[in-house]
Amino acid sequence: MKIKSVEPFILHLPLTSDSISDSTHSITHWGVVGTVIETTDGLKGYGFTGTHAHLASDRLITACIRDCYAPLLIGEDANEHQRLWTKLARYPSLQWVGRAGITHLALAAVDVALWDLKAKKAGVPLWSLLGGARTDRLEAYNTDIGWLSFSLEDLLAGSARAVEEEGFTRIKLKVGHDDPNNDVRRLEAVRKRLGPDVRIAIDGNGKWDLPTCQRFCERARDLDIYWFEEPLWYDDIAGHAALARSSTIPIALGEQLYTVDAFRAFISAGAVSYVQPDVTRLGGVTEYIQVADLALAHRLPVVPHAGEMSQVHVHLSYWHPASTILEYIPWIKDHFEEPSNVDGGIYRRPQQPGASTTVLKESFERYGKSLS
């Protein structure tokens, strides 16, 4: 299965709302930036990363795929994903460019495409190729009802709809107002509306400092918060560890960590209770597995950050024994041949060969962007 071509692409896909905001970002579209790898026997593998649809930076990722990685891949055996991952990740000329950010996002897209090829060649879904499903039910939690930009009225209506009409028993709400008391009041209202049995997680997107987080957690301690995601700046190991010691609310993080070494540092410091790897930020499926195995060794649950990558994470979550639940944000799923759909709060287990990353032709035609 020799690699014949490596062709990058950019899609800018509309959200389910006109725009959304959390504590640090405001966007109207989601970027799906990736590559199609074709082999000499006619198979095509699709892989991608997720962005905020900023075209100039998206083009940096596709340039890295086209100009840096493609020449290293042409003629190689696509089956040898581990060797190829190491070849790209450790390529000497790229070491000073960066071992995170653009180079790793590009690596993720390539690696996912290689796994997609491998599963298609075997004629099975990725979860089956990896060793089979650990369960027949993967529960979803809904984040798309909880954006910080939503009014309290819309927040309550969306949360109630998700639970009472759509079958979700878990939701996640964004926090991070300049005055944290606003967030406490919103959480109190949602908890009162939904009752005690719904699991409510929160996500700060790294907005607050440690004293603010500690005061917030004290005020919110009776609201039965399932986890507090990214309460502090993403690289602050000591701060997260201090918050973990001072609060009864478990900490979740990982979407902004790019290497297994970064995860190891947080885990070793006791700074995380729920591990949230993302194949689009890590170097694809290959490095994701390393992180999930690390979490398993420390008896920590894995709950992938899946806002833009549930297409692949649904396979990994059905398979890996450390996995528990999976995030649901339905922005991009309908642009793929096999969408990562949820029925009654449960993810459908994929059935088609591959990693569920094959993009619909009409989505390329309608939402594709120029690479230059």
Model-assigned labels for residue ranges:
Residues L105, D111-L148:
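Glycine-rich, aromatic-flanked loop segments that form ligand/cofactor-binding clefts
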Residues T49, N142-D144, L173-V175, I202-G206, ...:
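A cross-domain feature marking catalytic cores of carbohydrate-active enzymes
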Residues S5, E38-K121:
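Metal- or metallocofactor-binding catalytic centers and their adjacent structured scaffolds
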Residues I3, G42, Y69, V110, ...:
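Conserved, mostly hydrophobic/aromatic
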Residues G354-S372:
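Extended hydrophobic packing segments that form well-structured cores
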Residues E218, D224, D235-I346, P350:
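Shared catalytic-loop signature of beta/alpha-barrel
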